Amino acid sequence: MAQQNTDMLDGLQAAVLAEAQKKQTKNKKEYEFDPLAMYFGEDLYIAGIKIVQPKIYDILDMGESKFYFGLSPILYNSTSIRVMLWDAKIDWCKIHDIEVFDILNKIPSFDFSAMRLIFPDYKIEKMQLMNIKLPDSDTSELCLYDKDKDFILKESEYNQIAEYVRSMLNIHPKIEMAKGKITKEWMIDEDRMNAAQRTDKESSILLPLVSACVNHPGFKYKLQELRQMGICEFMDSVQRLQVYESSRALMAGSYSGFCDVSKVPKEQFNFMRELHE
């Protein structure tokens, strides 16, 4: 009986997640960023706020953990901190990314050094979350407001900034929503168990990628030269090497006769194909 209940909950969760993901995909607004400008490390202005792309040496100088944690208000969404929200009696399914930004910015003694690296000309973390009625709207909406400068950052503009930073660092938080209370509690319990099983040892995000690239015969940069690479250029190299290796493997398999590639799309054989289709 207990196993049946577990299987039923698993099925319920899977169905809810599938529906939520489908809805998120349907409703998600696509932001158009110039991939070539990102590759060359050009600055971007959104709503007048300058966004600077860090180089590898910037992250090294600051410290990788400090860098990524310092950007967590922008990199995280409600799913990322749902246990914390649930413990505070807040339903993560009803929280927007702009609210997550505001919540994490209010953590005492939070280090904003990484924010200064990405936003050198403006302290975006000083903005306050408010419901504001905009001139072109009949209803109020969530915005970030800078009282000193009388500057309003609309939620759509904040989402565009967040998506750009996430794309720049190649970090996209998962989105997991649920409807019923039982399913939500099940997901929270699962998160708690996963957290308990994790060790306190810090793991590097960049080290495995740097090591793989430097030791790959097709990577043209030496270790010390890698310091000068922009983070977008580096992430592009990581993905391009993966595409190159998979294309070579498919090509070798097709010529060997031991692999049926008749149903493999021809584009998969092209290592110069678009990475973000």
Range-by-range predicted roles:
Residues E99-S203:
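Hydrophobic, aromatic-lined core segments that form the binding pocket/scaffold
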Residues S254-E277:
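Long, intrinsically disordered, low-complexity Ser/Thr/Pro-rich regulatory/activation regions
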